């Protein structure tokens, strides 16, 4: 049975956010690199660093937290995996869902790479719906 790397990074980011940890380390693959790039561009994470340890590459993500006097409190954002290995979900560009009326982000895997719902609508292409972020 194969590993679902997208579900692993979503779960690790969600767990670190709920535990108010500022730094998360995830495995580096081409898919995770594209998803992390989208998260950084959309402002859900603060910083990304590439780290190499024992011939394995990792991404070190710095999550965005607001500072409080007593302790940092998290910006509430949710990630949800939609298409999974047992049940793939595809959509054409006209039927890509809008999360929170366009405030959230849908990440798609298209024939032109991994992109957000806004980019896919502008280019007029659909694809596999990987996850929702809001």
Curated annotation (Swiss-Prot):
It comes from the Eukaryota. One of its GO terms (molecular function) is structural constituent of ribosome. InterPro entries: Ribosomal_uS8, Ribosomal_uS8_CS, Ribosomal_uS8_sf. GO terms for cellular component: chloroplast; ribonucleoprotein complex; ribosome. Keywords: Chloroplast, Plastid, Ribonucleoprotein, Ribosomal protein, RNA-binding, rRNA-binding. GO terms for biological process: translation. SUPFAM superfamilies: Ribosomal protein S8. Belongs to the universal ribosomal protein uS8 family. NCBIfam families: PRK00136.1. This is Small ribosomal subunit protein uS8c. It comes from Ipomoea purpurea.
């Amino acid at each position: 049975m194969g590993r679902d790397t997208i579900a692993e990074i979503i779960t690790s980011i969600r767990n670190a956010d709920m535990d108010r940890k500022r730094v998360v380390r995830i495995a580096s693959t081409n898919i995770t690199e594209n998803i992390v790039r989208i998260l950084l561009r959309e402002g859900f994470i603060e910083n990304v660093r590439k780290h190499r340890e024992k011939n394995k590459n990792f991404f070190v993500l710095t999550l965005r937290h607001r500072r409080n006097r007593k302790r940092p409190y998290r910006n509430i954002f949710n990630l949800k995996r939609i298409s999974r290995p047992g049940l793939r979900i595809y959509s054409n560009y006209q039927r890509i869902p809008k999360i929170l009326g366009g405030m959230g982000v849908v990440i798609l895997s298209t024939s032109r790479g991994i992109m957000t719902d806004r980019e896919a609508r502008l280019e007029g292409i659909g694809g596999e719906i990987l996850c929702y972020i809001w």
